[in-house]
Amino acid sequence: MLPNTGRLAGCTVFITGASRGIGKAIALKAAKDGANIVIAAKTAQPHPKLLGTIYTAAEEIEAVGGKALPCIVDVRDEQQISAAVEKAIKKFGGIDILVNNASAISLTNTLDTPTKRLDLMMNVNTRGTYLASKACIPYLKKSKVAHILNISPPLNLNPVWFKQHCAYTIAKYGMSMYVLGMAEEFKGEIAVNALWPKTAIHTAAMDMLGGPGIESQCRKVDIIADAAYSIFQKPKSFTGNFVIDENILKEEGIENFDVYAIKPGHPLQPDFFLDEYPEAVSKKVESTGAVPEFKEEKLQLQPKPRSGAVEETFRIVKDSLSDDVVKATQAIYLFELSGEDGGTWFLDLKSKGGNVGYGEPSDQADVVMSMTTDDFVKMFSGKLKPTMAFMSGKLKIKGNMALAIKLEKLMNQMNARL
């Protein structure tokens, strides 16, 4: 990992969304130098599912040598941002670094993204970044080490990611486009850059999106913190860059990236905003004996499932059912399959003993999954992770996401038989 140099001692770092996850990790890294940290986040009271508040983060920051100023800030509220900036100036005398980390996410396609969710992503990601930047810039311009760092992806017009997550992509790209504009607008005064991970990062949000077991495919938040720390030490002339965490750390001389892995040696889930991963990551994944299902369609030369593969899969699923499985799951799944051997199938894990069949279930489905027959067979045979299928757009899910995650556990039990 990247060692601390002490160069941020006395600097004031204003971080949105710093009560947990990536934001807190960046805060702790800077705090080890003796930096002042403004924790600008919403969570003042403990959340039932997400650990950490602005006050617990402040305790951790001060425990490693930093000074903390916890501020209740919803980045959608301009007055709350302004109030936090004023408190920071009053307590620390200035602001040297702004990290726009707060973000809202919904991995849904256009028709499945409610307007309320669209507004949330636009207001937190795009508008919130603008408001925080605007409030801090007058003070950043007075700093000798002024930086704005947006946690946002490089601009990539490949439609692969836009296709299934258009609203989220636009909201994040808004953050990235501020880098283009502000880097030029404040050239020579403030360095403005973006930082994004090469692979999935393990956070509470990733657990909610990916479900149990996703952490083994992720890196720790420490890699983003180290990459951000590297950027903070660069001169103002380093501006307008879209930095990938692994790349900048290689420039710092880091060679062993297993130290950042949750499960060293396990294949990592690549980030889909990037085009660079297919060949390099495929080779690494294949070397472990796994199947690199994240490849682009044009790179996939997988054979079609044999005739009747779907029916055979459901037969094996049915043989695997039991009262214990039904009791543990309590859900009805509907599969809308396209392609060869396509059609509508159901998996009833509510009725005694469970049941499968072709057509509609007798009761309303709790979860509807849409995919090709090829991908259905691969999922149930363990060659395609449901999380990867969902995030790459191969799998569409409607209904109860918690019950969808339960099905993944059942799939894991059946893999050996399929």
Swiss-Prot record:
For this record, an example GO cellular component is: membrane
List the keywords (alphabetical). Acetylation, Hydroxylation, Mitochondrion, NADP, Oxidoreductase, Peroxisome
Name the source organism. Answer: Homo sapiens
Mind telling me which InterPro entries this protein's record contains?
Answer: HSDL2 (IPR051935), NAD(P)-bd_dom_sf (IPR036291), Sc_DH/Rdtase_CS (IPR020904), SCP2_sterol-bd_dom (IPR003033), SCP2_sterol-bd_dom_sf (IPR036527), SDR_fam (IPR002347)
* Entry EC number(s): 1.-.-.-
Provide the GO biological process annotations: cholesterol homeostasis
Name the NCBIfam families on file.
Answer: PRK08278.1
Q: Where is the SCP2 domain?
A: 306-415
Residues with N6-acetyllysine modification: K116
Catalytic machinery residues: Y168 (proton acceptor)
Q: Which residues carry this modification: N6-succinyllysine?
A: K318
Q: What is this protein called?
A: Hydroxysteroid dehydrogenase-like protein 2
Family indicated by similarity: Belongs to the short-chain dehydrogenases/reductases (SDR) family.
Pfam families reported for this sequence: adh_short, SCP2
Which residues are recorded as binding NADP(+)? G17, A18, S19, R20, G21, I22, G23, K42, D74, K172
Which GO terms label this protein's molecular function in UniProt? oxidoreductase activity
Q: Which residues carry this modification: N6-(2-hydroxyisobutyryl)lysine?
A: K42
* Cellular localisation: Peroxisome; Mitochondrion
Q: What is its main location?
A: other
> What tissues is it present in?
Ubiquitous.
